[in-house]
Design a protein with these regions (language model features):
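Conserved, mostly hydrophobic/aromatic
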Residues: 19, 23, 43, 86
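Short, glycine/acidic-rich beta->alpha junctions
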Residues: 7, 11, 35, 42, ...
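Iron-sulfur (Fe-S) cluster-binding segments and ferredoxin-like electron-carrier domains
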Residues: 25-42
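Cys/His-rich finger/ribbon microdomains and the adjacent scaffold used
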Residues: 1-7, 36-39, 52
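Conserved SAM/AdoMet-binding glycine-rich loop
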Residues: 44-181
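Glycine-centered small-residue hotspots that permit tight backbone geometry or close packing
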Residues: 18, 22, 29-30, 113, ...
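Short helix/loop capping segments that flank catalytic or ligand/cofactor-binding pockets
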Residues: 22-25, 35, 68, 120-121
Length: 181
């Protein structure tokens, strides 16, 4: 535990190593194959230990929404008065149950990673998310009480056009409208 570090207020728990999605820009999905998820029981035990030291359990992995039992883990942490804070979530894998668990866990912000402003460019980089899937995840998270959504985008991708960059602004605006309701 290092209180001076960037995540010093969290007890960090590695929930998975590697990634199953194979996004073309990400090394984790290629370097750390096959993906390995820690069991729910192992994660719960780590959370119990972590809650003895910190009130926030930081869940670490390349993509947390696909970790088996992650919603149950967030509920488990919330039931014990803690907050589960996952790293980035893939919007099309977020379930309503996970969104509610994150809201119950007093998360003020959650990060999703559309990466590109258009479905065309997301397909190019193998980040196969549709805008309706991204907006549905935003609706569920905001509806569950999450007050802020952080979005990860990249600019300068191969085949990117001006319209793709403009799409970042448009998608961000649509998500922002949901957050401000």
């Amino acid at each position: 535990l290092t209180p001076e570090a960037v995540f010093g207020d969290m007890y960090l728990v590695e929930a998975s190593r590697g990634c199953e999605w194979g996004c073309r820009f990400c090394a984790a999905g290629y370097m750390y194959r096959p993906i390995r998820h820690r069991s729910l029981e192992t994660l719960q035990a780590a959370a119990v230990e972590g809650l003895e030291h910190r009130s926030t359990i930081g869940l670490v992995g390349a993509e947390m929404a696909s970790v088996p039992g992650v919603a149950e883990l967030c509920e488990f942490v919330a039931d014990r008065g803690g907050r589960a804070s996952p790293s980035s979530l893939k919007a099309d894998v977020i379930t309503n149950r996970l969104a509610r668990a994150l809201g119950r866990s007093a998360n003020q912000s959650v990060t999703i990673a559309p990466e590109a402003g258009s479905e065309r460019l997301r397909r190019v980089i193998n980040k196969n998310l549709t805008e309706p899937e991204i907006l549905r995840a935003a609706d569920w998270l905001v509806g569950a009480g999450v007050r802020a959504l952080k979005l990860y985008f990249m600019i300068g991708l191969p085949t990117e056009t001006h319209e793709d960059v403009e799409g970042i602004l448009e998608l961000t605006r649509r998500i922002g409208e949901r957050v401000q309701r």
